A protein has these predicted regions:
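Structural motif
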Residues: 14, 88-92
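N-terminal beta-loop-helix "entrance" segment that forms/cooperates
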Residues: 51-72
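A short acidic, amphipathic alpha-helical/loop segment
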Residues: 30-33, 101-108
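Glycine-rich, aromatic-bearing surface loops/beta-hairpins
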Residues: 106-161
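Histidine-anchored nucleotide/phosphate-binding helix
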Residues: 28-40
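Short internal beta-strands
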Residues: 44-50, 117-120
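Nucleotide-activated donor-dependent transferases that construct or modify glycoconjugates
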Residues: 13-22
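Short acidic, S/G/P-rich loop/turn micro-motifs used as interaction or catalytic elements
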Residues: 22-26, 53, 95-101, 123
């Protein structure tokens, strides 16, 4: 008989990063930056997204120094819905309406968690207006250059760049 999979202990020290499609280049660099900072501040970090974005991250972090745990988004949502996964902090990247929908799903499934929605891309203000649920929003027009968005993220979390 196979032992059931082990999941991190629920609690405020667990962070979940929800990734969108890897179409916009800044996302990958910022995910690695955020994960690095969170791990330095004592968080266990889990990333979730579609296979394409996870494969890009696996290539970028082959030794799993920044992202030791990753899973397919639909699997992660199922684990959360079944109360097998929890987090105190959920960070969602959104550059399309699908990202906003995933953030709304996380808000519904994780009502007690801090939800930070990072909205970026070519037209982030329009997307930000569609996020009509409780969350902290970080909004920046960013496609290729992550520096301004990184500065805003660092400000929200109190990290020194």
């Amino acid at each position: 008989m196979t032992a059931p999979p082990q999941f991190p202990t629920p609690g405020p020290g667990n962070a979940l990063i929800v990734l969108g499609c890897p179409e916009v280049p800044v996302q990958q660099a910022l995910v690695l930056h955020i994960s690095h900072q969170l791990r330095n501040h004592g968080f266990a970090v889990h990333a979730t997204g579609n296979p394409a974005v996870l494969n890009l991250l696996k290539v970028s972090d082959p030794e799993k120094r920044y992202l030791p745990e990753m899973s397919i988004l639909e699997t992660c949502i199922g684990e959360i819905a079944e109360k097998r996964r929890d987090c105190g902090l959920c960070i969602v990247f959104a550059h399309s309406d699908a990202g906003i929908s995933y953030a709304a799903t996380m808000r519904h499934l994780l009502p007690a968690s801090r939800l930070v929605l990072i909205i970026f891309g070519k037209d982030p203000e329009t997307l930000a207006a569609a996020a009509d649920f409780t969350c902290e929003k970080i909004v920046e027009k960013a496609v290729h250059n992550p520096m301004q968005l990184r500065k805003k993220i660092n400000g929200v979390f109190g990290w020194v760049a």
